[in-house]
């Protein structure tokens, strides 16, 4: 249904990393379709800006992972928090859509609550994994919590949080085609062994993950001389950010692709993927993969004390068991990465078992239509 426009139809949107930027942009498109004339301001990346967001600050300024990484950025992050609070007080948006990024967005939600601005929070914080006490704060400052994982709505029962499972945005994606079709679309030779490497969307992730990935690639090339390696460059990054790492491996054939992570993984025989949303994005392409992640020693020590779950890879969490290998911290070495990928390339039974489990994960994500359901929730709370 279409909603009649009003002169003051303005909303605040805040999205940090690349996946949140994409989810928010698709929701904004649905809002514009349902309520022609609606406008948005806030913080977002390239996709939100293309959708029409008036960006008051770049997304990368607030998208920081890990305690050690956050500390030097605190003054800038707090400055943006104050700036958004002032902008909300001046513009009085009719609602706010805050996407992921809980340490920042829950603080902003508290300020918006004092201003009487309804808050829709999209992509629940992982309170089921750690810091479960945050549910009390969420109940105080968030009007609607929209969950993208099927078990999260049940977790909020009895907490006072108004939560709804809206389906995962990735459920919009059609089933993957054959690897050869993706290779053709990317201009890659169809017959060569193809390995995807997904190092993440933050500079800190590149610094920690891309060098060992490239070293693992050198080892894999020794076993597979025809191998080609493909790296998707996140929209929040510039190709130039990767060049210093590639310079040390000039003889290695590495193809950079702007965005298009799902196509890059779809083109692969196996993939090295950083932990986070990327693991689900890659998993939906039904390609064998190995999940890797490294934090600073301080961030990892804190996480070890606080995290209450057995797995870190989202596909493993959704499956309820370890369906893909996880290499964390010291285990994320070039030797281990290469060995795990080699196992998936050479062991057909292991490869097929992983793909079968990934099919089950894909089926658990709900029906398509998440952006529309989120847009309707935003319109439902607008003052």
Curated annotation (Swiss-Prot):
Catalytic activity: a lipid X + a UDP-2-N,3-O-bis[(3R)-3-hydroxyacyl]-alpha-D-glucosamine = a lipid A disaccharide + UDP + H(+)
One Gene Ontology biological process: lipid A biosynthetic process
Record-listed E.C. numbers: 2.4.1.182
GO CC entries: membrane
Disulfide bond residue pairs: none
Function text: Condensation of UDP-2,3-diacylglucosamine and 2,3-diacylglucosamine-1-phosphate to form lipid A disaccharide, a precursor of lipid A, a phosphorylated glycolipid that anchors the lipopolysaccharide to the outer membrane of the cell.
Family per record: Belongs to the LpxB family.
Protein name as annotated: Lipid-A-disaccharide synthase
Organism: Anaeromyxobacter sp. (strain K)
Gene name linked to the record: lpxB
């Amino acid at each position: 249904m279409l909603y009649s426009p009003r002169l003051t139809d303005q909303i605040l949107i805040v999205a940090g990393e690349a996946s949140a930027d994409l989810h928010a942009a698709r929701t904004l498109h649905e809002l514009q379709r349902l309520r022609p004339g609606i406008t948005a301001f806030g913080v977002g990346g390239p996709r939100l800006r293309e959708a029409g967001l008036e960006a008051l600050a770049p997304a990368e300024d607030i998208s920081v992972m890990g305690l050690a990484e956050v500390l030097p950025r605190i003054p800038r992050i707090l400055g943006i928090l104050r700036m958004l609070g002032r902008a909300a007080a001046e513009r009085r948006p009719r609602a706010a859509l805050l996407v992921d990024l809980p340490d920042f967005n829950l603080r902003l939600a508290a300020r918006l609550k004092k201003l009487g601005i309804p808050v829709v929070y999209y992509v629940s914080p992982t309170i089921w994994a750690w810091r479960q006490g945050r549910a009390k704060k969420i109940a105080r400052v968030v009007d609607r919590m929209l969950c993208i994982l099927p078990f999260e709505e049940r977790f909020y029962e009895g907490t006072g949080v108004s939560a709804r499972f809206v389906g995962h945005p990735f459920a919009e994606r059609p089933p993957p085609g054959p690897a050869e079709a993706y290779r053709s679309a990317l201009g890659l030779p169809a017959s060569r062994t193809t390995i995807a490497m997904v190092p993440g969307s933050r500079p800190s992730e590149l610094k920690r993950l891309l060098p060992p990935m490239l070293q693992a690639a050198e080892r894999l090339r020794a076993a597979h001389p025809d191998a080609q390696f493909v790296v998707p460059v996140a929209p929040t990054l510039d190709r130039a950010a990767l060049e210093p790492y590639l310079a040390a491996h000039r003889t290695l054939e590495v193809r950079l692709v702007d965005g298009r992570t799902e196509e890059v993984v779809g083109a692969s025989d196996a993939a090295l993927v950083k932990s986070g949303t990327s693991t689900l994005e890659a998993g939906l392409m039904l390609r064998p993969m190995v999940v890797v992640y490294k934090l600073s020693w301080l961030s990892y020590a804190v996480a070890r004390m606080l995290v209450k779950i057995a797995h870190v890879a989202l596909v493993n969490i959704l499956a309820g068991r370890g369906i893909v290998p996880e290499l964390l911290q010291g285990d994320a070495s070039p030797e281990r990465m290469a060995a795990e990928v080699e196992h998936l390339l050479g062991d057909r039974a292991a490869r097929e078992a992983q793909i079968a489990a990934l099919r089950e994960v894909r089926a658990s994500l709900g029906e398509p239509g998440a952006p529309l359901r989120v847009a309707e929730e935003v319109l439902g709370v607008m003052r």
